[in-house]
Amino acid sequence: MPHVDIKCFPRDLNDEQKTALAADIAEVIIRHFNSKDSSVSVALNQVQQEDWKAQVWDTEIGPKLDELIKKPGYSM
């Protein structure tokens, strides 16, 4: 049951763009995890730039740098 939780600065994506993004992400997950499409879920959470450090970096990125399989090219 892979679940992907995308956090990003706000983007003006329409429903078609969101659907395409989810399909692309799901395709990669299905290929690498040998999952079924019905098992994959994708969330898109838009976080204001001024809230990024408190809501994302301090809770999900910074404390878990050793666990990340793709590390960011920035620090806070």
UniProtKB/Swiss-Prot annotation:
Keyword Cytoplasm set for record: yes
Protein name as annotated: Tautomerase PptA
Quaternary state and interactors: Homodimer.
Active site residues according to the UniProt entry: P2
Sequence similarity: Belongs to the 4-oxalocrotonate tautomerase family. PptA subfamily.
Gene: pptA
Entry superkingdom: Bacteria
Location in the cell: Cytoplasm
EC number: 5.3.2.-
One Pfam family here: Tautomerase
Key words, A-Z: Cytoplasm, Isomerase
Entry annotated with the keyword Transferase: no
Principal localisation: cytoplasm
Species assigned in the record: Enterobacter sp. (strain 638)
GO cellular component, one term: cytoplasm
GO terms, molecular function: intramolecular oxidoreductase activity, interconverting keto- and enol-groups
